[in-house]
Amino acid sequence: MEGRGPYRIYDPGGSVPSGEASAAFERLVKENSRLKEKMQGIKMLGELLEESQMEATRLRQKAEELVKDNELLPPPSPSLGSFDPLAELTGKDSNVTASPTAPACPSDKPAPVQKPPSSGTSSEFEVVTPEEQNSPESSSHANAMALGPLPREDGNLMLHLQRLETTLSVCAEEPDHGQLFTHLGRMALEFNRLASKVHKNEQRTSILQTLCEQLRKENEALKAKLDKGLEQRDQAAERLREENLELKKLLMSNGNKEGASGRPGSPKMEGTGKKAVAGQQQASVTAGKVPEVVALGAAEKKVKMLEQQRSELLEVNKQWDQHFRSMKQQYEQKITELRQKLADLQKQVTDLEAEREQKQRDFDRKLLLAKSKIEMEETDKEQLTAEAKELRQKVKYLQDQLSPLTRQREYQEKEIQRLNKALEEALSIQTPPSSPPTAFGSPEGAGALLRKQELVTQNELLKQQVKIFEEDFQRERSDRERMNEEKEELKKQVEKLQAQVTLSNAQLKAFKDEEKAREALRQQKRKAKASGERYHVEPHPEHLCGAYPYAYPPMPAMVPHHGFEDWSQIRYPPPPMAMEHPPPLPNSRLFHLPEYTWRLPCGGVRNPNQSSQVMDPPTARPTEPESPKNDREGPQ
C-alpha cells in the first residue's frame, strides 16, 4: 500500500455527480498521504526505540560485568571498615523490569531484564511498566537497597577514626617514651591500612566515573540519532506534502482541461457544453450499464477497505501516541530522579570529604603537638645534661683552685703563729733604754713599749702618706699651669687669626667696590665717546672722600678656630683703596671736601699720625702697616 499511488476509480457518470466524486477522491488522497506520514513516523520511532533498548541492554550487561568483577574482589577486614559508600551502591538494584523489546507489537508481554547500577548521570534510561508504577513496595525496596550501606560505612569510618583519636590522645598523654613509640607504631599500622582502603576506594571511584562518562557519551549518541531520525521524518513529511500538492495540481489541471474541451472559448457556451456532456453520459449509461455496476461495486469495496485501513491506522496511531507520551513521561521522571539522586550523592561525598579533611587536619595538628612536645622534652633534657656537666666541671675547677688556697692559708697561719712567737720572744728580750729598771719585768712596761712602737709605726705611715699626697698635689698644680699656658697661647692665636680674617674681608670688599667703580667709569667713557657731547662729570664719591690710608697685601680667607665661629660674623667698615681717576674735563671744577677723620674698627688707642688725611693729591697711598697691638685689640 505504501509503494503504490492512490487508486484511480473510473466513473462513467450517471450514478454520482462528478463534483462529489472528485471531492471524495481528494479527501481520500489527503487521508492516505497523512496516514503515510504517520506510519513512517511511527516506524522511525519504533526503530529508535529498538536501538535505545538494545543500547540500554548492552549497558546493563556491562554494568553487571563490573558488579561481578567488584564482587570477586577480596572482602575488606572488619577492623578497617569501608570509606566508599558509592562502591556499595553498584550491585543492589537489579530486580527492576524493562520495557518490551518489540515496539511494533504493543500487545506482547514485557520480559524482565536486570537493571544496571545507578551511575549518577542523566544518560541512564530505564523503562518502567505501569505495574511497577503502581507498586510502591518495589520502589521503596529498591531505594532502601540503594541507600542501605551508607550508615554501615559511615559507622565503620567513625569507629576507625575514633580509634585513631584514642590512640593520639593516649600518645599525647603517655609519660613513658617506650610506650609512646609503641603507640606511634600502632598508629602507623592504622594509617597504612587506611591508606590502602582509600586507594581501593579511589580505584572504584575512577571505574565508576569511567562508566558514567561512557554512559553519558552513549546517551549523547542516542540523542543525536533521535534528532537525526526526527529530521529525516520531517524531510519525508515535507516530501509527501509536496507530492500531495503536485497531485492536487494535476487533478486541477485535469479538471480544467475537461472543462476547456466542452467550451469553445466564450463563457456563454459553458451551459450548453454541460448539457451536451450530460446528454452524452446518459446515452453512455444505457450503452454500458453492466460494466458500470461492476466498476461501482469494486470501487465501493476499495473505499470500504481504505476506510477500514484508515480507522485501524488511526487507532494504532492513537495507541502509539499514548505509549510514546507515557514513555516520554516515564523517562523524564526517571531522569529527574537520577539527577536528584546524583545531587544527593555528590552532596554526601562532599560532606564526607570535608569531614575526612577536617579529621586529617585535627590528626596532623595533634601529631605536630605530640612531636613538638617530644622535641621540647628532648631539648630540655639535653639542656639539663649540659648544665649538669658544666656544673660538674665548675665544681672540679673550684676544688682545684681551693686546694692550693687551703694549703696557702695553712702555711700563712703557721707563719703567723711563728712570727707571733718570734715577736713575743723579741719583745720579751728587748727592753727600752729610757724605761725605769722596775718596769722590765712588769707587764705594764711591756704594754707601754708595745703602744709606743705602734705609735711610732703609725707616725711613720702618716708621714709617708702626707709625702705621697704632696707629690700628687704638686703634679696636679704643674699640669694645671701647663694647661692654662696652652690655653692662653691658643687664645692669642685665635685672636690673631680673627684679626687677619676681618682685615682680609675688608680688603676683599674694598676691591669689589673699586672694581664696580671702574666698571661704571668705563661705561661713562663709552657713553661720552658715543654721544660726542661735552658735559660736566660729577666726581665719584670715593674720589671726593679719598681712600683709606692703610694698605695691606691681600690675604687668603682663614677658617675660624673651633669654638670661635661666631666671631667671624662681626663686620667692620672696609678700608677704602686708592683708585685711578680720569683727568678732569676742561670746564669742570674740583670741589675739595673738608678733612675727614677715619676711625679705627675698634675703640682702642688712635694713632695721631693716622688720624686724618686730605685727598688733594690722590696719587699717593700710605703703606704704613697697623701695629700688632691694634690688630690684637680689634676683635675684642
From Swiss-Prot:
Residues 452-510 are annotated as: Ubiquitin-binding domain (UBD). Residues 431-588 are annotated as: Required for inhibitory activity of TNF-induced NF-kappa-B activation. It comes from the Eukaryota. The modification Phosphotyrosine is found at Y552. Keywords: Coiled coil, Cytoplasm, Inflammatory response, Methylation, Nucleus, Phosphoprotein. The modification Phosphothreonine is found at T438. The modification Phosphoserine is found at S77, S284, S403, S442, S627. Residues 20-73, 196-258, 294-535 form a coiled coil. Residues 94-412 are annotated as: Interaction with Nef. GO terms for cellular component: cytosol; nucleoplasm. The modification Omega-N-methylarginine is found at R599. A motif (Nuclear localization signal) lies at residues 524-530. Residues 61-151, 252-283, 603-636 are annotated as: Disordered. Ubiquitous. Strongly expressed in peripheral blood lymphocytes, spleen and skeletal muscle, and is weakly expressed in the brain. In peripheral blood mononucleocytes, isoform 4 is mainly expressed and isoform 1 and isoform 7 are almost not expressed. Expression of isoform 1 and isoform 7 increases in leukemic cells. Phosphorylation at Tyr-552 by SRC-family kinases recruits phosphoinositide-3-kinase (PI3K) PIK3CD:p85 heterodimer which results in integrin activation and leukocyte adhesion to activated endothelium during inflammation. Residues 351-367 are annotated as: Interaction with Shigella flexneri ipah9.8. The modification Asymmetric dimethylarginine is found at R571, R599. PANTHER family: TNFAIP3-INTERACTING PROTEIN 1, TNFAIP3-INTERACTING PROTEIN COILED COIL FAMILY MEMBER. Inhibits NF-kappa-B activation and TNF-induced NF-kappa-B-dependent gene expression by regulating TAX1BP1 and A20/TNFAIP3-mediated deubiquitination of IKBKG; proposed to link A20/TNFAIP3 to ubiquitinated IKBKG. Involved in regulation of EGF-induced ERK1/ERK2 signaling pathway; blocks MAPK3/MAPK1 nuclear translocation and MAPK1-dependent transcription. Increases cell surface CD4(T4) antigen expression. Involved in the anti-inflammatory response of macrophages and positively regulates TLR-induced activation of CEBPB. Interacts with TNFAIP3 and IKBKG (polyubiquitinated); facilitates TNFAIP3-mediated de-ubiquitination of NEMO/IKBKG. Interacts with polyubiquitin. Interacts with MAPK1, SELPLG and PIK3CD. Interacts with IRAK1 (polyubiquitinated). Interacts with MYD88; the interaction is indicative for participation in an activated TLR-signaling complex. Interacts with HIV-1 matrix protein. Interacts with TAX1BP1. This is TNFAIP3-interacting protein 1. The gene is TNIP1.
